[in-house]
Structure formats: structure tokens, C-alpha cells
């Protein structure tokens, strides 16, 4: 099998994530595809990245309504799977009273939920470039149906724990696959705003699901929490199957490329086997792995040869409906059933944990999930008793304040961040850097820790209700702004390996959330609520402050990880 990859990756000046997003006086000075064709821009002169082809089957060329419909479905799936993952708490009291299932057991179920959310991602990710995006969504929604039915039928401790494994598996698609699909249909300069809606959908599912689930449990029975989850997941599965088109697209087919004489999967495998030997050889030549990859024309001769390609894309016909909604869309590079390719990808994808941007995004986003565990636990501990005396619905309504804060935070790190990036790029000779998105988090650096102190210390010391609700809004602001920035920063840094990067973030994020789920109650009991939240606020401040070294050395980190990035792009042919 011959493999293809665009030539830009082998340019010695290439740095992952660094892009020219504004036209210069000489447009020919920039052409990501080396095609010689005019660079495509929007009306404001922003260069469209990735460059769209002329094919009617290119998702970047879809009409506005077609994109919005697809975006709506993806956002609904995101909110739904987040809601199903956060509705079990509404049934805890009933399960404890009727069947004697302990709260600790249900806490264990929450830990299992987080583990399956994070680690399911890496099992689904390799299938994305081999079999298409749709199959993962369908499997995850089916898992959501099964998990919800199992939870609705719960009678034993094992039911409440292992039903959450399937529920967690269902949310895995929203942790990485959705971001990949969004990057398939939207341009890079739009991703901040697009991710605003994604984080909002996650926020609505996470913060309003407990309220809705409590209302269902009170008006019907606790079992209907599970039944309604299964019904909505099933209905969404049907809509998705018939209404959500495949977005995977072989972009290299429409642009001049370089062709390798050997299989890329084999190429990556051999690179792994001989990595140590290669390092020694490069050291003898005076090169180091942390230097930019340099490939001279002589070195590429015989290994890479230009392919002559006359674009016939504009003459292509739109694929028939049945092909656009096919259960599986095999990659043009698929070998047989792709089992060996799947296993190679599964192993190689762990390389993303060597990328600093993955760790920064994963830690920032993961800690926000951890804080949610703490404030939900504190709500259950304090606000049913004197002097608050809230009902279950009253406690659930408290999260509306958190949602309002999340909306504001998402707007700042999404819509305003996109404008901020364009403004900074203009001041930087049209060149955009992913680190531009981090500047707005200096606002969050102050607001988010303040929110933890206002809520946690306020609950313990019985501060006025206004302080409690403002604290929750500030926590929500941190959730929304950090979530949006973490996603967009990583997607900007390594735009051709979105799903691999998001898998790394999801594993870090949900593993952290799992750990904090188990230690939360013990920490609050051992240190006291006020002291615990003060420590959390310090952790929050320090973790967000990691953006400072990223602003200084982020580009250097991306340059040093160029080889790893290229190997991952080669592995998937740039198809995610």
C-alpha cells in the first residue's frame, strides 16, 4: 500500500499549530498544499484552514443549514450523554431506602463511570479514521440505552455500579469524537465559537440533569430516571442513523501530495522499533531529537516523489444519500478488515501523552470536573439542614447559578477568544499561535479560585445566600472558560490529530475525576469544609497559572514534538 501526506509537514520551518491566517500582499507566499492554486479566504481576508477542496462531498463546503443541522445533532448528543451520566444521584435516596444500597456503593458507581468515560475513548478512537465517524456515535448511544435500562431495573449493588460502565461508555463519544467531527466541518478560526456551544451543551447536561432527574423521580418513580434516559437515547439513535451524515473526508486526494513507497503503519512501527538507534545516529551527526525535523530535497528523492494530480473535484457528483449515512465508511487506506491497523493505532496513540499541550489541557479540564464533585457533595451535606432547609429540588436548582456562570465563561473563551486570536494575529504579521487563546484565562485565574472560597467557606460559615450563589456562578465561569480554552488550545496546537489529542485529555480528565470522587468525602470529613476549599482554591490558582510557562515556551514545546506529531498524522493519513 502506498501512503500519502501533504508536503507541508516536511518543511524544515514547519511548527505544529503555527499558521498564517491572514493574506499577505503576495498570496502566493502562503499555500498549505503547495498546489499553486489561489488561497481561499473569507470576506475578512482570513485564510481558510484547512483549505477546502472543490468537491461537493467536502464537509467544509456544506451549506450553512446542512452544517447547522449536523452541529445541532452533535451538540444534542453531547448534552444528552452528559445528562445521562449525571442523573443517577436523583435515585440514590430511593435505592438506599428500598434496597439498602449504600451511598458508598453508588459513589463507587460514579468512579466506574469516570473510568469508562475516559478509557473507552482510546478504544473508539482508532476506528474513526478506519471505519468513519458515525459508527462510534451509534455504538455509544446504544451503550447509553443499555446502561439506562439496566439502571432503571436496579435491585442490587452490582446493578448500580455496572450500569454506570455502559453509561460512561456512551459519553466517550462526546469526549473526543464530537470535537473531531466539528473540526471536519468548521474552519480553524471558527473553532473557539463552535466549542462554546459544545461546552454549553456539556454544562446543560451536567448542571441541569440533576434537577430534571429529581423532578422525574418525585413525579413518577426513581426508575423513570433510567427509563427516560433509555427512551431519549433510543430516539436519538434513530435520528442519528437517518439524519447525521458521515464527515470523514480524504483531503489529500484533492491536493498535491508526496507519496511514500512503503506503508505508513509499517513506517511508524519501524520507527518505534529503531527509535533508540536513530537517536544515536542523529547524535553522531550533531543533531538532537528536540531540534526541528529537517528533510532535504536530496533525502526525499527516491523516498517521496511528487504525484501529478489534475483536480476533477468540481465535476464530482454529490454522493447518494445511502452512502452519506452508511453504517461504515471504510478508509481508502484500509487493509483487509483493518484489525492490524487498529491495533497499531491503539498502541501508537499513547504517544499523545508526550505532548505538553495534552497534559496542560487534561489537567485544567480534569480539575474542573473534580471541583464539581466537591461542590455537589457539599450541596448534599449542608443545604438540606438548618439554616438552609432546602428540598431536593431546591438543592438541584442551585446549579442554575453554576450554569449561568458557565455560559458567560464559554462566551469569553469562545466568541471573544476567536476575536482576540484574530486581533493578535494581525499584530503578529498575520501569524497565529495557539498560545494566543491562553491570555484570556488570566481573568479566570482570579475568578475561579474566588468562587471556590465563596461557596465552600460560605457554606461552612453560613455566609449570605448571595455569596453562595455568586460563588457557584464563579465556579461555573471557571468550568466554561477553562473547558473551552483547553479544547481549542489543543485543537489549534495539533489540528490534524484532534481525536488522538482529545483521547489523551479525556483519559487525564476522567482519571482525575475518578480519584477525586473516591477521596472527596474523606477529605471534607478529615480537613473540614472550609479548609478543603481553601486548598482547592490554591490548587486551582496554581494549575491555571501553568498558562504562564505555556505562553513563554509553548511554541518551543510544539517544535520539539514535531516528530511525534508527524508520525501520528502519517499513521492516519491526516484523516483523524
Model-derived regions: residue spans:
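Extracytoplasmic
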Residues: 52, 66-103, 124, 174, ...
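Pair of pore-lining "gating" transmembrane helices in MFS-fold secondary transporters
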Residues: 67-86, 165-166, 354-372, 473-474
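Cytoplasmic helix-loop-helix junction between adjacent transmembrane helices
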Residues: 165-201
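Loop-to-transmembrane helix entry/capping segments in MFS-fold secondary transporters
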Residues: 103-104, 188-198, 392, 496-505
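Glycine-rich segments within core transmembrane alpha-helices of 12-TM secondary carriers
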Residues: 190-218, 227-236, 240, 402-410, ...
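Intrinsically disordered, low-complexity terminal tails of fungal membrane proteins
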Residues: 1-63, 247-345, 422-428, 561-576
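C-terminal membrane-cytosol helix-exit motif in multi-pass small-molecule transporters
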Residues: 233-256, 547-551
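C-terminal transmembrane bundle
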Residues: 82, 86, 94, 111-114, ...
